[in-house]
């Protein structure tokens, strides 16, 4: 009997999902993206060679894997072709192994233009988007005016719809945001130039997944961003535009929720966040700067420096609730090597003095929240590239155990370096 496993971020994204997806794909036939778009940056290092995937599932680097892009993903044809070109230049067969749902909403140049215009207009109050048109594309989807992959294959109807949508966007871009309009003919020509390539990869993703379930093969669902960036459950409005949580697997791929066997939450041994929004344990001192330096905390897609802080058990407990997390993979344990002491946030002190153990739901409720810390001894020994649990320092084992106690879920995988081999699988999600 095959297993279906979801891998998702349990913090604010950038937890190291790509490496773990790549590590576990030797066990699966299908890897599925079910939300987000090319705003995701999944960095893989295999035998010292670095690959950053933004849209195509991380399983593409394994010859035995078929990669699926589900209906919950907003698809930029331009970004897809660029990423395919980069992979094919390295001899990786993409076209025969990538299948795309025809229900995927398209990201087109006017979405990108609107994204940039809005962020510029917000100034210091900006959300901190990646500027790739993700939000406006999801907005079109919900407003039922968006163009989908399936629309590409009726050129006359597509052109008519595109003209109407461009009129809508260009009016706002020119008259409200005072920026240049998006050219209709160029947009049309560019997308039609690659429509046939996309058509060759279109498939009924839902049926493929259900057939795979019947055949008893293993399936892996690859999440993007992180739980605390979920459109519904994150620190709204400082969130992404999709459901980054386990519920997104069902809605973003058509795979029934009862078919999911295991949810692997990815956590860093500390916390990071990119862009604006609440971050209770953020460090503004030399410790925070040292974590950022040692952890190379810069966004894989944007290059933006990440904000760094101590491990927040309160936020991760919320992720456990929302996702029914079965087990955790803890990454970047080695970044904490050499610190004399470490802190874990165990509760929040609200502005009214109340002590709470679960994270607020709305960004406004995070104002004035103070972290309550538990201090633990650090370790001087090196954990980088350690691949046996018994070789870890006792202080590191104690730190992991305390986090397990605080969040109520075991750490099943430990990552001690960026390469796929620098990992300890304590309990295999596909054998659990």
From Swiss-Prot:
Residue sites binding IMP per the record: 14-17, 39-42, 130, 144, 225, 240, 304
Biochemical pathway: Purine metabolism; AMP biosynthesis via de novo pathway; AMP from IMP: step 1/2
Necessary cofactors: Mg(2+)
Molecular function terms, GO-annotated: adenylosuccinate synthase activity; GTP binding; magnesium ion binding
Residues annotated as binding GTP: 13-19, 41-43, 306, 332-334, 415-417
An annotated GO cellular component: cytoplasm
Intracellular or extracellular location(s): Cytoplasm
Active site: 14 (proton acceptor), 42 (proton donor)
Family of the protein in this entry: Belongs to the adenylosuccinate synthetase family.
Record's protein name: Adenylosuccinate synthetase
């Amino acid at each position: 009997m095959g297993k279906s496993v979801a891998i998702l971020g349990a913090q604010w994204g950038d937890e190291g999902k790509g490496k773990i997806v790549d590590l576990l794909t030797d066990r699966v036939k299908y890897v599925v993206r079910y939300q987000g778009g090319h705003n995701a940056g999944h960095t893989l290092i295999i035998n010292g060679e670095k690959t950053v995937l933004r849209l195509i599932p991380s399983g593409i680097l394994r010859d035995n894997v078929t990669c699926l892009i589900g209906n919950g993903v907003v698809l930029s044809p331009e970004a897809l072709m660029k990423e395919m070109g980069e992979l094919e230049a390295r001899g990786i067969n993409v076209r025969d192994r990538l299948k795309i749902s025809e229900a995927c909403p398209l990201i087109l140049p006017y979405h990108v233009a609107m994204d940039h215009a809005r962020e510029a207009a917000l100034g210091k109050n900006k959300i901190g988007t990646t500027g790739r048109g993700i939000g406006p594309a999801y907005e079109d989807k919900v407003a039922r005016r968006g163009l989908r992959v399936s629309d590409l294959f009726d050129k006359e109807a597509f052109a008519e719809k595109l003209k109407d949508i461009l009129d809508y966007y260009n009016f706002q871009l020119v008259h409200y945001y005072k920026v240049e309009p998006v050219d209709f003919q160029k947009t049309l020509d560019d997308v039609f130039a690659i429509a046939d390539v996309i058509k060759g990869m279109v498939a009924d993703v839902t049926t493929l997944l259900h057939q795979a379930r019947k055949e008893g093969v293993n399936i892996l669902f690859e999440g993007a961003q992180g739980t605390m960036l979920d459109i519904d459950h994150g620190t709204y409005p400082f969130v992404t535009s999709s459901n980054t949580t386990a519920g997104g697997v069902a809605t973003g791929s058509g795979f029934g929720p009862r078919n999911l066997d295991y949810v692997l939450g990815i956590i860093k041994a500390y916390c990071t966040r990119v862009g604006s929004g609440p971050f209770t344990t953020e460090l503004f001192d030399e410790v925070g700067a040292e974590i950022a330096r040692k952890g190379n905390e810069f966004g894989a897609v944007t290059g933006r420096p990440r904000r760094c802080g101590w491990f927040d058990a309160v936020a991760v407990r919320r992720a456990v609730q929302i996702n029914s997390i079965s087990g955790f993979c803890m990454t970047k344990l080695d970044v904490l090597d050499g610190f004399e002491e470490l802190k874990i946030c165990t509760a929040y002190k609200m502005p009214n003095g109340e002590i709470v153990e679960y994270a607020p739901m709305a960004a406004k409720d995070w104002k004035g929240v103070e972290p309550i810390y538990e201090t633990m001894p650090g370790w001087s020994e090196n954990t980088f590239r350690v691949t046996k649990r018994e070789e870890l320092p006792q202080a590191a084992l104690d730190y992991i155990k305390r986090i397990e106690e605080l969040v109520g879920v075991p750490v099943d995988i430990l990552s001690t370096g960026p390469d796929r081999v620098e990992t300890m699988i304590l309990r295999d999600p596909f054998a659990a």
